[in-house]
């Protein structure tokens, strides 16, 4: 697999690397590992004993499995989910970006710029009619305008389209854990 360059712990893959094989650790997940992942995604603040009770293990084997899932990179980190509205970030914007330049050097510069912008919550390279999609959160239109001006001055862009979310209908953080 050819990696362009890590940016803030994220890896950007070259376009020829779309077929990424399953990581070996994914093949080793058994039913108990999957239960642990489901429980942790619901509430990562549970004690190891509580998690063990829910999945049918005592504390030590449960803790060893959690450590292995972390070491294998299946569990990336444990975080607190914060209500964006309660901290004054009431506007969500989906920003579509089109570029005339598709070189690796341009992508590195663009990825560095976007990754340094704290308003950007998610950043994707897309297939289809746009090249990149960003999910951005800001306090108000004035804050978005400041963000927009930073974005368009970072690198040459062909087109930027902003779509403002009117209402959040569904938002989950727990991944659907596939059966073994």
Residue ranges and their predicted role:
Residues 1-180:
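A compositional/biophysical signature of low hydrophobicity enriched in polar/charged and small residues
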């Amino acid at each position: 697999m050819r990696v362009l360059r890590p940016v803030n712990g994220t890896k950007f893959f070259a376009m020829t690397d779309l077929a990424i094989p399953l990581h070996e650790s994914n093949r080793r997940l058994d039913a108990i590992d999957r239960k642990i992942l489901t429980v942790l995604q619901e509430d990562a603040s549970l004690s190891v004993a509580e998690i063990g009770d829910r999945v049918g293990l005592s504390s030590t084997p449960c803790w060893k499995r959690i450590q292995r899932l972390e070491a294998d990179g299946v569990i990336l980190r444990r975080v607190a989910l914060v209500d964006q509205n309660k901290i004054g970030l009431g506007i969500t914007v989906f920003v579509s970006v089109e570029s005339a330049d598709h070189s690796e050097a341009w992508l590195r510069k663009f990825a560095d710029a976007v990754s340094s912008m704290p308003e950007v919550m998610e950043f994707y390279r897309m297939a289809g009619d746009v090249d990149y999609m960003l999910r951005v959160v800001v306090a108000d239109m004035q804050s978005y305008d400041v963000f927009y001006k930073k974005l368009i001055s970072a690198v040459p862009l062909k087109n930027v389209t902003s779509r403002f979310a009117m209402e959040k209908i569904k938002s989950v953080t727990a991944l659907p854990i596939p059966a073994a």
